[in-house]
Amino acid sequence: MKLSLFSTFAAVIIGALALPQGPGGGGGSVTCPGGQSTSNSQCCVWFDVLDDLQTNFYQGSKCESPVRKILRIVFHDAIGFSPALTAAGQFGGGGADGSIIAHSNIELAFPANGGLTDTIEALRAVGINHGVSFGDLIQFATAVGMSNCPGSPRLEFLTGRSNSSQPSPPSLIPGPGNTVTAILDRMGDAGFSPDEVVDLLAAHSLASQEGLNSAIFRSPLDSTPQVFDTQFYIETLLKGTTQPGPSLGFAEELSPFPGEFRMRSDALLARDSRTACRWQSMTSSNEVMGQRYRAAMAKMSVLGFDRNALTDCSDVIPSAVSNNAAPVIPGGLTVDDIEVSCPSEPFPEIATASGPLPSLAPAP
């Protein structure tokens, strides 16, 4: 059942903060055919999907390129949602409805969705084979994929989205070449505050680029692209001094050390007066970063839907391995290399790593 976006947000945040953090499949009152325990019989099918994804799609539960692709897909699918278009009498998009798979012939032609065809087709096959909706599958695959990356929060997973959808309107996906105002306006239309935009960008902790500069294919956005941690927020604030490729790519800025790619939109958001203090607050605590990202993702996952009409199957989601490493300023650099942009708060005390300036390899 579709519902107004704004009528569900309070329940979303409460639900996200109350999520269990234990292992998947435990503590439920229903025993599935495979012997797993869960809270609701509607969740049993997802154990089969879990095994399929981890074995085949994630190639043995790895935190590699398929995880980064699903993080793009989950955002690009859900953000196709515009109350402003609806108010103007146009179709505003269905939100997290799986339309990027159902209508891939249209949505994969959007410039922002370049390079996703193979991943979309692999997900389509999984959805059809297991008889689950594409909207549910995208959310589930995202939560499972992140569980393969140390330090990741255990995301909420709600099932029950219909497989009925329409193609998303074009031009609703904010991109790396947009201004901060354009990004905040687009995200604000979908119901997200500037703080929540910064929170959602925690996904870039696991990110690399493929289509912005082909000469440095899969160059990561931080020094730990297989760990969900605050390094992305720290390193985006470092002074840009290095051109990692033979020339700068589309929407690329100078980076702090060889091999790291810096998106222009990230650099701008880290330094803009509307977002800089929230950005700085994400640098020093992996726990805070995870909590905020989980809440923002829970909100995004129900864009266009009534969360009360969905079934909570979060207990199927595995828990990621903990990340106990403290945030650091990379070797060869100091706090003096940070471009502090929040005037109201001092920059947190963060240790400096020993050793030379990093030189990063492409992300796997």
UniProtKB/Swiss-Prot annotation:
Its cofactor is Ca(2+); heme b. It comes from Arthromyces ramosus. Its EC number is 1.11.1.7. It is an enzyme of class 1 (oxidoreductase). Binds 2 calcium ions per subunit. Binds 1 heme b (iron(II)-protoporphyrin IX) group per subunit. One of its GO terms (molecular function) is lactoperoxidase activity. Ca(2+) 1 binds at D77, G95, D97, S99. Glycans are attached at N163. Residues 1-20 form the signal peptide. SUPFAM superfamilies: Heme-dependent peroxidases. One of its GO terms (cellular component) is extracellular region. Heme b binds at H204. The modification Pyrrolidone carboxylic acid is found at Q21. The record marks R72 as: Transition state stabilizer. Belongs to the peroxidase family. Ligninase subfamily. It catalyses: 2 a phenolic donor + H2O2 = 2 a phenolic radical donor + 2 H2O. Pfam families: peroxidase (PF00141), Peroxidase_ext (PF11895). PROSITE patterns: PEROXIDASE_1, PEROXIDASE_2, PEROXIDASE_4. Keywords: Calcium, Disulfide bond, Glycoprotein, Heme, Hydrogen peroxide, Iron, Metal-binding, Oxidoreductase, Peroxidase, Pyrrolidone carboxylic acid, Secreted, Signal. The active site is at H76. Disulfide bonds join C32-C44, C43-C313, C63-C149, C277-C342. One of its GO terms (biological process) is cellular response to oxidative stress. This is Peroxidase. Gene3D superfamilies: 1.10.520.10, Peroxidase, domain 2. Its main location: secreted. It is found in: Secreted. Ca(2+) 2 binds at S205, D222, T224, V227, D229.
